[in-house]
Amino acid sequence: MIGRLHGTVAERHPPALLLDVGGVGYELEAPMSTFYALPAGDQAVTLWTHLAVRDDGQALYGFASRAERDLFRVLIRISGVGPKLALALLSGMNAEGLQRCIEREDVATLTRLPGVGRKTAQRLIVELRDRLDGLLPAASGGVPARTGSGEQLDAPAGPQGSREDAVSALVALGYKPAEAGRLVNAVPGANDLPSEELIRRALQAAVR
């Protein structure tokens, strides 16, 4: 079982990334919360991992903290919530936001996330109500999400095609292509933003 990897990010195509560990490239899928925490350059990072065995092969998932990885594991144990939906949940809102939705039984906000219907939202509330305690404090050893000043690390410069990359990422997280395009196009200044910032703002708008 692979529990943690330390290396440099060679490629990033949300929600997928390639982590170079001693010359070996590991393909991982990660929630957008992890992408936001990654440094822009070639600084070494540590990702907590979960290995899933599927009928068509294996998939490795990476997370910025152990707490985030543990929350992912709690989510995929809920009936009807697979890894793809769990990634969408952790991409659409952070752990604290998810906890608030559960505590307030906020079905309306949960159903704005891709793949979450009313029944799934209600199941999440019932199943998670007593399971989130102790999961939210961030574990040490993962990639730093913020600088010492409290400001978010700079995102990598956005290449041409950031809009297309953002739409592709939202589709991979479960949004329909038309909805993904609408969310991205609605972001002010979309043409000037790097893809990960564009994804972040589109997801924020989706759950408002």
UniProtKB/Swiss-Prot annotation:
Region (Domain III): 158-208
Region (Disordered): 139-162
Superkingdom, taxonomy of origin: Bacteria
Residue numbers spanned by region Domain II: 65-143
Pfam family, any one: RuvA_N
Region (Flexible linker), start-end ranges: 144-157
Record keywords: Cytoplasm, DNA damage, DNA recombination, DNA repair, DNA-binding
Localization in the cell: Cytoplasm
GO CC, any one term: Holliday junction helicase complex
GO BP: DNA recombination; DNA repair
Domain I: region residues: 1-64
GO MF term list: ATP binding; four-way junction DNA binding; four-way junction helicase activity
Subunit structure: Homotetramer. Forms an RuvA(8)-RuvB(12)-Holliday junction (HJ) complex. HJ DNA is sandwiched between 2 RuvA tetramers; dsDNA enters through RuvA and exits via RuvB. An RuvB hexamer assembles on each DNA strand where it exits the tetramer. Each RuvB hexamer is contacted by two RuvA subunits (via domain III) on 2 adjacent RuvB subunits; this complex drives branch migration. In the full resolvosome a probable DNA-RuvA(4)-RuvB(12)-RuvC(2) complex forms which resolves the HJ.
Function: The RuvA-RuvB-RuvC complex processes Holliday junction (HJ) DNA during genetic recombination and DNA repair, while the RuvA-RuvB complex plays an important role in the rescue of blocked DNA replication forks via replication fork reversal (RFR). RuvA specifically binds to HJ cruciform DNA, conferring on it an open structure. The RuvB hexamer acts as an ATP-dependent pump, pulling dsDNA into and through the RuvAB complex. HJ branch migration allows RuvC to scan DNA until it finds its consensus sequence, where it cleaves and resolves the cruciform DNA.
NCBIfam families tied to this protein: ruvA
Family under the similarity heading: Belongs to the RuvA family.
Free-text note on domains in this protein's UniProt record: Has three domains with a flexible linker between the domains II and III and assumes an 'L' shape. Domain III is highly mobile and contacts RuvB.
Protein name: Holliday junction branch migration complex subunit RuvA
